[in-house]
């Protein structure tokens, strides 16, 4: 009987620890960059992927956003366009990969971003991580580990959000 009680206590502790360890994964994600823009009137959100590997595309519609005190966004400069296009090239390559395996996926069907709307009146915030790996033959391969791109188009007052974590 004592052995049973000891095993019971151990199992309860294991269950308790399992719950405590898993709680952070259940917490609601708070997007401070999105919150910094104030309340949006409508949104569209499309995703593809699983627990760790996923791609998101979203549009947030605003009536007005004041960027004067915003700690995240900067007005786009001509010199930013290379970095923006590099990220969008990567993002769109994932959209094409998904299109090749299943063209009916919601992110494929609803991806409608048009780069021609990008100009120096718009605002951008990019948070990204790169990787570089040198192969045995000395060749280096590099790319993005993950990124969040927030692009605000001032003409339409739409925030476009691009996320990739693959």
Task: Describe each model-derived feature in a short phrase.
Residues 20-93:
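N-terminal export/targeting and maturation segments
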Residues 4-7, 12, 67, 72-76, ...:
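Extended hydrophobic/Leu-rich segments
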Residues 91-166:
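Extracytoplasmic electrostatic interaction patches
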Residues 1-24:
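Sec-dependent bacterial lipoprotein signal peptides
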Residues 7, 55-58, 65-68, 124, ...:
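Intrinsic disorder/low-complexity detector
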Residues 12, 43-46, 145:
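Residue-level detector of functional hotspots within protein domains
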